[in-house]
């Protein structure tokens, strides 16, 4: 069985198209996108609407999940940072974890072949 890794990135929504394009160029075969809301070290943010200030506790983000061969993890991380990093608070986070097994339900392919 080959070594596989899940790369999960929490990013600003407007980077999705560029991120999809960049990861596809690397050979990433698929990804799952989930709309999420959260806050980090700085908490929420304050926005003004029609002269009134509102505290937004949870900021909208996207979670991009993909499973790749472990040998591609550093390239995938670099690609995500290339597209998503602005240098400002709120750029997001990347989490990497090991995947024990992947099975394509339709064909019963396993491991890297299932990606």
Where are the language model's segments positioned?
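Positively charged, small/polar-rich N-terminal and surface patches that mediate targeting and assembly
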Residues: 1-115
């Amino acid at each position: 069985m080959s070594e596989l890794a899940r790369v999960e990135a929490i990013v600003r929504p407007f980077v999705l198209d560029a991120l999809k394009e960049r990861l596809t160029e690397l050979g990433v075969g698929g990804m799952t996108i989930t709309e999420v809301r959260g806050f980090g070290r700085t908490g929420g943010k304050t926005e003004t609407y029609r002269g009134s200030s509102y505290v937004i506790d949870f900021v909208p983000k996207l979670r991009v999940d993909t499973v790749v061969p472990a040998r591609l993890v550093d390239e995938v991380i670099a690609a995500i940072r290339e597209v998503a990093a602005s240098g400002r608070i709120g750029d997001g986070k990347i989490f990497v974890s090991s995947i024990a097994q992947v099975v394509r339900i339709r064909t019963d392919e396993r491991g890297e072949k299932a990606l």
